[in-house]
Amino acid sequence: MTDNQIPKDYNHKNEVKWQKKWQEEDIYRFIGSGTKPRYIIDTPPPYPTGSIHMGHVLNWVYMDIIARFKRMRGFDVLFPQGWDCHGLPTEVKVEETHNIKKSDVSREEFRRLCVELTQENIRMMKEQMQRLGFSQDWNHEFVTMTPEYMRRTQLSFLRMYRDGLIYQGVHPVNWCPRCETAIAFAEVEYIENETNLNYVRFPVEGADEHITIATTRPELMAACVAVVVHPDDERFREFEDKLIEVPLFGQKVKLIKDPEVDPEFGTGAVMVCTFGDKTDVSWVNRHGLDVIDAIDERGYMTEAAGKYQGLTIAECKEKIVEDLENEGFLLKKEPVRQNVGTCWRCKTPIEILVKKQWFVAVKKLIPQVREAAEEMKWVPGHMKTRLLNWTGSMDWDWCISRQRIFATPIPVWYCSECGRVHVADEEMLPVDPTRDGPGITCECGSTEFIGEEDVLDTWMDSSISPLSVAGWPDESYRELFPADLRPQGHDIIRTWAFYTILRCMALTGEKPFSEIVINGMVFGEDGHKMSKSRGNVIAPEEVLEDYGADALRLWAAGSVPGSDVPFAWKDVKYGYKFLRKFWNAFRFISIHLTENPEVEARPMDRWILSRLMNLVAEVTESLDDYNFAAAVNRVQTFIWHDFCDEYIEAVKYRLYSDEDPESRMAAQNTLRMVLDTCLRLLAPVAPHFTEEVHQHVGEGSIHLRGWPEHIPEIVDPEIERSGDLAVEIIGEIRRFKSSSKMPLNAPLKAATIYTDNESAEMIKPFLDDIAGTMNIGDISLVAGKPEITERAVELEPRMEKIGPEFRSDAPAIISWLTGADPHEVYEEIQRNGEIEVEGNRLTMDHISFRKEVIGTAGERVDVLNLDEPEVIIEIVR
């Protein structure tokens, strides 16, 4: 092969060619025959927005590296791709796109429009995934809005309902007034903001006194059902058994005691409202208090708010504070920072409303979830603590019903006569109770039913992803369950990870996966979360256009699981530069890749091969431990420095020499082995580049090749130590040539290497390589130190010193120095610290000398030094 047959530059535009070839040949398909050990990845199903972002890239690069690595290790890998379709954002987008409200059309039509939008978004995202070279098996694609997937979701509901793990009840729930739906506690995000702590006078009945309440939510005074203080707070002892009047609204409430009150906050007296927060819920339940609904589902004040009915929460708050001040009830306002629960989708502050909803009995399953989490391997390990801490904070059951349309229907009907709940038979699934009937007669004799209009939380869909991939509930599902790996972001540990473990334990009694690898978030180059408002968003397409998928993948692989990572153009550019460096090395190597018999490897060959075997062991271990950054950095360092900068340069003279054919063949064979091994080590991270190179030197796809074998017999620590020293010597001579403005291939007349006996024995086998690499005519090795002398061969008077200091004597001094022997002048100053000239004393400050080193043979030499071990190199130009 000649390098003319290979393009001069690596062209990342060819990536698309390989992607099409991989798809056509279906090389990533899961066989499932049982002839190979299986490896199952529980792939996260993204929400189909229509475009992927850098967070997706980071997550999928992690799992794609694992999938490719495991395939090469001999596993039959099931790497599916799913789509978590249902949810409010799609409904909002459909309303915007078609300029409608969901109430303007039938539920069926609205759902059809949502499906249509989602299908198009999936198509676009699928193309983007494929453009990044991800190796999913699209034969195992799952889509949560399809009848088959909804059947599984509904079946999981029925079985958990049958086992008493799902129930319907009237309870306080987190409610988003913007989305007009209940949300789970895990979907509440807390943000810090500034508000006012209002100090309000509450009159005491039958006394000319008052209790001062500090509250950040005066708009809930209409729903005040008690005033609570700490049992040990003596300030309120006199008000025991008295009623407290709520200003503006007039209801009289009891003063109660509870140890949860913080007597140091505000005034120590707190109003209990239904409901300001979770603590209110706890107090209402503990003390048997009434419930007043002051806020409706849309965030407006109800009839209970009296004259404030119909105002928004914010409007009501402002008006009540104004009225309290006007009527003398408001004593003061203080600014305060507080954490406010918001909806994770729209960031609207949540309310707590009492609603009839469907719940998963989370608290019954917490012990099983914790046990399963302990059995799993977490990468990084400390991420397990996040899940365990979350399970320890679970006060409420999981509210799984939503007041939306585009989601999996709850398979339930209510008898029109007696209200009895009827769940679907498993054989009927999937069903839509708003459209389908139960086909039964109620125990009361009625055949009229009302279908449940609420739908399931989308986490009810995605939390059975490992079961769906395995084919549950078919008996054969246990062949593919539990999964081996769950890759996901740390931001959804308390949702997707928690719910999946909980649901799979409830449905199967088994943990859903053996290992879980957590990726971090991707920030902008400015260190902030990527957002359009900051202008720091980088779309994957921008990188693909200029640098290709592999450069982007190298950036992602350089991060550490669990840690947030800033996107950095410099890292992408470095990855691209590395690929071009490797490509150029490959072009050179390609002209020397001839078919040779096996010949004995030379010392420099043995050095690189020993280091290569260490590389194989280290990269294999790193990938087994999901330490992607260590694996990639090690491969890049080896290829760039050990292989390209050192070994290839050190064997060029052998490749072009006809004097020793076996030496040339040994170098050629070594080049082939190192190239092939490095390509396979790099293949999981840079699949396009390695495929492109492999097509010139091998057969078939590199991704169907096996992982490089670690051959212990090739590892030789002694040859590595010796080779490292030889490489250091070559590097020192190379630096000497560079600093001397000499071409690196410029010939040197001779070189003598002086060192101790042990180091001399180490260097001896590499003398030919040192001489050949640096074009040295005669090279020798001496145990000991050289006999060298330093001689001044030129001197130059420093006029800027002599003129001002010696004035009228300066011309005579210059004249004398011009005719003097430079070395005699130099020795005189060295001996006495000065020399007398025309009655004046001159030092080294007055004269510059150019010196030469004279070697053992009496010739001028250059002397180079290495410190560890001590090596002196005497160069004759």
Curated annotation (Swiss-Prot):
List residues binding ATP.
532
Uppermost EC category: ligase
Q: Please list the disulfide bridges.
A: none
Catalyses which reaction(s): tRNA(Val) + L-valine + ATP = L-valyl-tRNA(Val) + AMP + diphosphate
Q: What is its EC number?
A: 6.1.1.9
Indicate where this protein is primarily found.
cytoplasm
Q: Which GO terms describe its molecular function?
A: aminoacyl-tRNA deacylase activity; ATP binding; valine-tRNA ligase activity
- Motif 'HIGH' region is found at 46-56
Motif extent ('KMSKS' region): 529-533
Q: Which GO terms describe its cellular component?
A: cytosol
Keywords from UniProt, A to Z, are:
Aminoacyl-tRNA synthetase, ATP-binding, Cytoplasm, Ligase, Nucleotide-binding, Protein biosynthesis
Report the HAMAP family cross-referenced here.
Val_tRNA_synth_type2 (MF_02005)
Q: What is known of its domains?
A: ValRS has two distinct active sites: one for aminoacylation and one for editing. The misactivated threonine is translocated from the active site to the editing site.
| Family as reported in the entry's similarity comment | Belongs to the class-I aminoacyl-tRNA synthetase family. ValS type 2 subfamily.
> What is the name listed in the Swiss-Prot or TrEMBL entry for this protein?
Valine--tRNA ligase
> What organism is the protein native to?
Methanothermobacter thermautotrophicus (strain ATCC 29096 / DSM 1053 / JCM 10044 / NBRC 100330 / Delta H)
